[in-house]
Curated annotation (Swiss-Prot):
Post-translational modification summary for this protein: Undergoes a complex proteolytic maturation which generates a variety of processed secreted forms with increased activity toward VEGFR-3 and VEGFR-2. VEGF-D first form an antiparallel homodimer linked by disulfide bonds before secretion. The fully processed VEGF-D is composed mostly of two VEGF homology domains (VHDs) bound by non-covalent interactions.
Glycosylation sites: 155, 185, 287
TM spans (from-to): none
Record propeptide residues: 22-88, 206-354
Extent of the Sequence repeats: 222-237, 258-273, 277-293, 301-318
Cysteines joined through disulfide linkages: 111-153, 142-189, 146-191
Any Gene Ontology biological process: positive regulation of cell population proliferation
Function of the protein: Growth factor active in angiogenesis, lymphangiogenesis and endothelial cell growth, stimulating their proliferation and migration and also has effects on the permeability of blood vessels. May function in the formation of the venous and lymphatic vascular systems during embryogenesis, and also in the maintenance of differentiated lymphatic endothelium in adults. Binds and activates VEGFR-2 (KDR/FLK1) and VEGFR-3 (FLT4) receptors.
Keyword Secreted belongs to the record: yes
Gene from which the chain derives: VEGFD
GO MF term (any one): vascular endothelial growth factor receptor binding
Organism (species): Homo sapiens
Protein's UniProt name: Vascular endothelial growth factor D
UniProt keyword Manganese present: no
């Protein structure tokens, strides 16, 4: 009996040591993961604009979101449905109009000088037997929200503006006197801490992270023939992903927004040809092919059409403002001339019949 009790105690001690060793082994990993989450939270809390927030949460493709905000017609470049809009993001989709509203609201609520009215008597600290008419004046004072809980909107520069008011004293012994009053006007504002603090002193709120969403980052863009695996937190081949074929992941791949011969220029917010043409050749605007321009002002004029130098084509509509030429015909303002041989043929005839 005593021997069995000793064996049980030994196994219990070994089990306790094993559990402690396992917790010590994973402790640094958990602390490191928690530290990463805290840093990410700090960055998100300190974001001062929608663009900065998207830059943090979607660091690889924030420029495209900026383009979508700037260009309202960007979403119409793709013929797919709204749920599969042209985007290189593999994260959550946002409606572009909603983002515009959020961005405008964010800008309006930033810490900045705002027009407000202040009571003159309280502002100047006058006695109760003196009052002003009008009693209040319009000035600019700092107001708005800061992006961190520990900061407040404070003025960094002040000017004094003069207001002409009636000063009245009681009991009334004379008529109201017109006096100049100087009132503080805030010209600069900034979010400043109220007191020195620890950089990580923000109150933490309890957030439960679902087991299936514990990747250190959100879904990422995967190469063609690969899909994002939320369990492995990485891109895997389609045959390795158990959900392959059961869910439409076409929106996670590089979209065919600009076609096979073009690419999206994030700085210019437009589709451009991947390979430019030599200077002596014209580039087709749709398929980016290079060709020699065979049309000219003269050839188009013979067809009774107008020459478009950018597309090297003869079209009915003028790309510039039209004006009447000396011949009485209407032509482009920059192309008000006709073929030389035609003018030569018209010359003698015009001299005979002025």
């Amino acid at each position: 009996m005593y021997r069995e009790w000793v064996v049980v105690n030994v196994f219990m001690m070994l089990y306790v040591q094993l559990v402690q060793g396992s917790s010590n082994e994973h402790g640094p990993v958990k602390r490191s993961s928690q530290s990463t989450l805290e840093r990410s939270e700090q960055q998100i809390r300190a974001a001062s604009s929608l663009e900065e927030l998207l830059r943090i949460t979607h660091s690889e493709d924030w420029k495209l979101w900026r383009c979508r905000l700037r260009l309202k017609s960007f979403t119409s470049m793709d013929s797919r449905s709204a749920s599969h809009r042209s985007t290189r993001f593999a994260a959550t989709f946002y409606d572009i109009e909603t983002l515009k509203v959020i961005d405008e609201e964010w800008q309006r609520t930033q810490c900045s000088p705002r027009e407000t009215c202040v009571e003159v008597a309280s502002e100047l600290g006058k006695s109760t037997n003196t009052f002003f008419k009008p009693p209040c004046v319009n000035v600019f004072r700092c107001g708005g929200c800061c992006n961190e809980e520990s900061l407040i909107c404070m003025n960094t520069s002040t000017s004094y503006i003069s207001k002409q008011l009636f000063e009245i004293s009681v009991p009334l012994t004379s008529v109201p006197e017109l006096v100049p009053v100087k009132v503080a006007n805030h010209t600069g504002c900034k979010c400043l801490p109220t007191a020195p603090r620890h950089p990580y002193s923000i109150i933490r709120r309890s957030i439960q992270i679902p087991e299936e969403d514990r990747c250190s980052h959100s879904k990422k863009l995967c190469p063609i023939d690969m899909l994002w695996d939320s369990n492995k937190c990485k891109c895997v081949l389609q045959e390795e992903n158990p959900l392959a074929g059961t869910e439409d992941h076409s929106h996670l791949q590089e979209p065919a927004l600009c076609g096979p011969h073009m690419m999206f220029d994030e700085d210019r917010c437009e589709c451009v040809c991947k390979t430019p043409c030599p200077k002596d050749l014209i580039q087709h605007p749709k398929n980016c092919s290079c060709f020699e321009c065979k049309e000219s002002l003269e050839t188009c004029c013979q067809k009774h059409k107008l020459f478009h130098p950018d597309t090297c084509s003869c079209e009915d509509r003028c790309p510039f403002h039209t004006r009447p030429c000396a011949s009485g015909k209407t032509a482009c303002a920059k192309h008000c001339r006709f073929p030389k041989e035609k003018r030569a043929a018209q010359g003698p005839h015009s001299r005979k019949n002025p």
